[in-house]
């Protein structure tokens, strides 16, 4: 199948997907990661303006790994991305979860607030609203358990004090246990473009 990674960074995920047999394309806003994708993996990653050059309804999967929260013009980007998906194509969004246990624990020190580069903080109900608005079906929500440890470590850096690694490991563990399988520090939303979608 055909896969687009929007916000592909330095190309690690694209390279993995290609090794699994996917025909891959990448879009990345920053010049340096695009160059790194070329030098490390021989991937031709394009700037966001190249989205218009992709044929409508031609892609099976579009991934956005921790990207949507950085997008200033949310509606325009979502509409543009969805227009490239085939009917029943899948959109995969990885996003920080402001309702997670570690977000509530760290409060204003929670690293995933990441202001000012995060324009949005999506709760599950926000993704459900976007799905409804843009003709998508929310198929599944998955935890990203390792993010709880990473975000806790960054958050401990903001809090200050001693034993940051130990505290972060403990808080990350507790956050994952308390998540109940569906409320970790970061969540992956798997959405399907409905036959009547954009």
Annotate each language-model stretch with its function:
Residues 118:
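Conserved glycine-rich, hydrophobic/aromatic-active-site segments
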Residues 140-198:
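A C-terminal cap/extension of S-adenosyl-L-methionine-dependent methyltransferases
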Residues 1-107, 121-134, 144-146, 185-193:
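Conserved SAM-binding loop
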Residues 44, 109-112, 164, 177:
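Homeobox/homeodomain signature
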Residues 137:
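Short acidic/polar active-site loop segments enriched in Thr and Asp
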Residues 16-18, 92-93, 111, 159-165:
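N-terminal start-of-chain detector that recognizes signal peptides
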Residues 106-115, 154-161:
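Short glycine/proline- and charge-enriched loop/turn segments
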């Amino acid at each position: 199948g055909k896969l687009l990674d929007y916000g592909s960074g330095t190309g690690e995920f694209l390279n993995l997907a290609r090794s699994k047999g996917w025909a891959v394309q990448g879009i990345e806003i920053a010049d340096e990661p695009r160059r790194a994708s070329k030098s490390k993996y021989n991937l031709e990653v394009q700037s966001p303006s190249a989205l218009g050059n992709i044929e409508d309804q031609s892609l099976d999967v579009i991934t956005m790994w921790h990207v949507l929260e950085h997008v200033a013009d949310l509606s325009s980007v979502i509409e543009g991305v969805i227009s490239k998906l085939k009917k029943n194509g899948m959109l995969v969004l990885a996003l920080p979860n402001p309702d997670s246990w570690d977000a509530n624990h760290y409060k204003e020190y929670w690293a995933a607030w990441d202001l000012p580069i995060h324009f949005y903080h999506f709760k599950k109900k926000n993704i459900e609203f976007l799905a409804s608005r843009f003709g998508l079906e929310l198929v599944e929500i998955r935890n990203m358990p390792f993010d709880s440890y990473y975000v806790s470590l960054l958050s401990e850096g903001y809090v200050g004090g001693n034993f940051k690694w130990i505290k972060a490991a403990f808080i990350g563990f507790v956050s994952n246990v308390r998540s109940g399988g569906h409320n970790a520090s970061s969540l992956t939303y798997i959405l399907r473009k409905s036959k009547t979608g954009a």
